């Protein structure tokens, strides 16, 4: 009986504890990211932001959570009730399970699989389903238009993101995210410089992927009231909200992993290795999240035709050309990694 416990049940308990250890801090990070957003944008707009609930307004996310928890969930009369309820759950769950393959520090990863990049791409592609289901099930023209915009936008920029990731795979020679980070220790500086434009393209693409300004067309308040989640209240709205901000943190972690060295120090200086890798990972993700907030506070929204033109007529040809350029240079200089 004891052997059965240690062979089958104990590993499941360990996995469950790991999942809880990632999920609870992530939800807390999402909650306080909303607080940070309001404070940062407030400072940029010369106002104070939330400062009443608790010292410096630090309890504001808890107050917001309690408010949403006790609000009445209202389902439209003609809505498809089952899909209407499932849609925010799908969005929120998909935003969490993407973290399974992200390395927080050396050896600190829930599932260190050899196809981590494919897993991340698959999960990010699936996230559009929660939004399109919400728009369809709401039986509202505003929600449906927002959902169609979102699906078209996410599919358009997925192509560019995939091609950008191919350039990273060409230089590292692996689909394992931990090995991609370790490969960045030894990559020559000129290859890093060659990948820099692709890092910028990737970051702009994930702005569109997460429906953030200046690409928040699916939620355009002046055109679609609130987009695909216009009919949601209470916990349904809260789950969409949590999913959006969890996706922001996830894509920041992806950008850090692919282009900023993950948990590695930013410079090859011996004393920087004394600082734990987790600190560097959090620092880099935090910097990218600040860029998200900075962009929201300063840039206006794109028109929809401008958004599509940027994706299909600028980013797609550019990333295709860069894949050919990187592969040609790696072959010519004999730096193509063995897979």
Swiss-Prot record:
Where located?
Cell inner membrane
Catalyzed reactions: a quinone + NADH + 5 H(+)(in) = a quinol + NAD(+) + 4 H(+)(out)
UniProt entry keywords in alphabetical sequence:
Cell inner membrane, Cell membrane, Membrane, NAD, Quinone, Translocase, Transmembrane, Transmembrane helix, Ubiquinone
Which Gene Ontology molecular-function terms are recorded?
NADH dehydrogenase activity; oxidoreductase activity, acting on NAD(P)H, quinone or similar compound as acceptor; quinone binding
**What InterPro entries does this protein map onto?**
NADH_UbQ_OxRdtase_su1/FPO, NADH_UbQ_OxRdtase_su1_CS
| Cystine pairings recorded for this chain | none
Q: What family does the database annotate?
A: Belongs to the complex I subunit 1 family.
What is this protein's function? NDH-1 shuttles electrons from NADH, via FMN and iron-sulfur (Fe-S) centers, to quinones in the respiratory chain. The immediate electron acceptor for the enzyme in this species is believed to be ubiquinone. Couples the redox reaction to proton translocation (for every two electrons transferred, four hydrogen ions are translocated across the cytoplasmic membrane), and thus conserves the redox energy in a proton gradient. This subunit may bind ubiquinone.
Q: What protein does this entry describe? A: NADH-quinone oxidoreductase subunit H
- The gene for this chain is nuoH
């Amino acid at each position: 009986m004891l052997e059965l416990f240690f062979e089958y049940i104990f590993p499941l308990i360990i996995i469950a504890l790991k999942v809880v250890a990632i999920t609870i801090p992530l939800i807390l990070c999402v909650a306080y990211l909303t607080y940070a957003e309001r404070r940062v944008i407030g400072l940029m707009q010369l106002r104070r932001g939330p400062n009443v609930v608790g010292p410096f307004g630090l309890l504001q996310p808890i107050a917001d959570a309690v408010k949403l928890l006790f609000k009445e969930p209202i389902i439209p009369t003609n809505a498809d009730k089952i899909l209407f309820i499932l849609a925010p759950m799908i969005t929120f769950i998909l935003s969490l399970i993407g973290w399974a393959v992200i390395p927080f520090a050396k050896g600190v990863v829930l599932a260190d699989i050899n196809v981590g990049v494919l897993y991340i791409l698959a999960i990010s592609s699936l996230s559009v389903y929660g939004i399109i289901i919400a728009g369809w099930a709401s039986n509202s023209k505003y929600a449906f238009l927002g959902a169609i915009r979102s699906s078209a936008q996410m599919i358009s920029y997925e192509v560019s993101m995939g091609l950008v990731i191919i350039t990273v795979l060409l230089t590292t020679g692996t689909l394992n995210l931990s090995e991609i980070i370790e490969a960045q220790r030894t990559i020559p500086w000129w290859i890093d410089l060659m990948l820099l434009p692709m890092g910028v393209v990737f970051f702009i693409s994930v702005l569109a992927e997460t429906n953030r300004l200046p690409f928040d067309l699916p939620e355009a308040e002046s055109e679609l009231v609130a987009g695909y989640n216009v009919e949601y209240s209470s916990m349904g709205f809260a789950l969409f909200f949590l999913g959006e901000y969890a996706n922001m943190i996830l894509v920041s972690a992806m950008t850090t992993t692919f282009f900023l060295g993950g948990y590695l120090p930013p410079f090859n200086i011996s004393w920087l290795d004394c600082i734990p890798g987790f600190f560097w990972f959090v620092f880099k993700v935090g910097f990218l999240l600040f860029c998200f907030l900075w962009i929201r506070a300063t840039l206006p929204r794109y028109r929809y035709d401008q958004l599509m033109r940027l994706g299909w007529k600028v980013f797609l040809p550019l990333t295709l050309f860069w894949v050919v350029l990187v592969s040609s240079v790696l072959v010519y200089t004999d730096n193509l990694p063995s897979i």
